[in-house]
């Protein structure tokens, strides 16, 4: 299963800093998304589902890249927040959409009942100094539990603040996460260690597996 929260191309800047690849020309952003979606599609099982959070203002790019990369779009779910996010629009945003689908020639697995809806109501986190667009862990855990079983692999190629990782840990899944920005990698590691300790955290350097505590002690994290 894939659960991810790519850059929205809205040039977000908060106290936690800017997000890489978040301010591109329209055509470049489409190509960026298309390449990412192709890689995801090629690394998914035939019966795996995919969930992609995005911004409505970039909905056309997300949907076109999603379908062009070989995904079937089953629907669009809505994260309804408990509070608005102040911006420049006449209508203030209080939701984020999430594409849901699977491989065009594949099928999908469903592990919940028939009462689940497209509206997901979860409180948004208070402003974080660690990451400008942190998702609540409970929000990420919801689709994970609907579309995967325990011990399944969940791929998040844009791991960001690490909410998918934390949700996988809580629900007994295995998270394969990728994060380009080093400062957010540090955020992910600190967030995980603060909750679960550093006993299972290692740095791989070539064939060497080094306990994170040793790396942190020598100041090279």
Question: Which residues does each predicted region cover?
Answer:
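Core catalytic lobe of class I
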Residues: 1-185
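S-adenosyl-L-methionine
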Residues: 189-221
């Amino acid at each position: 299963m894939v659960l991810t929260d790519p850059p929205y191309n809205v040039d977000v800047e908060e106290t936690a800093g800017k997000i890489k690849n978040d301010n591109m020309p329209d055509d470049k952003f489409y190509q960026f998304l298309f390449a990412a979606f192709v890689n995801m599609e090629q690394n998914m099982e035939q019966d795996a589902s995919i969930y992609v959070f995005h911004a409505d203002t970039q909905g056309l790019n997300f949907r076109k890249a999603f379908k062009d990369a070989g995904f079937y779009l089953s629907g669009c779910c809505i994260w309804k927040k408990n509070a608005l996010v102040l911006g420049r629009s006449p209508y203030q945003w209080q939701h984020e959409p999430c594409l849901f689908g699977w491989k065009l020639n594949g099928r999908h697995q469903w592990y919940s009942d028939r009462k689940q809806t497209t509206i997901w109501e979860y409180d948004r986190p208070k402003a974080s100094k660690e990451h400008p667009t942190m998702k609540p862990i409970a929000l990420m855990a919801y689709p994970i539990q609907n579309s995967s079983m325990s011990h399944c692999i969940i791929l998040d190629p844009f791991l960001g603040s690490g909410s998918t990782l934390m949700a996988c840990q809580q629900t007994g899944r295995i998270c394969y996460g990728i994060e380009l920005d080093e400062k957010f990698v540090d955020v992910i590691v600190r967030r995980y260690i603060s909750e679960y300790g550093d006993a299972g955290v290692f740095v791989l350097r070539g064939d060497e597996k080094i306990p994170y505590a040793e790396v942190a002690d020598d100041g090279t994290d």
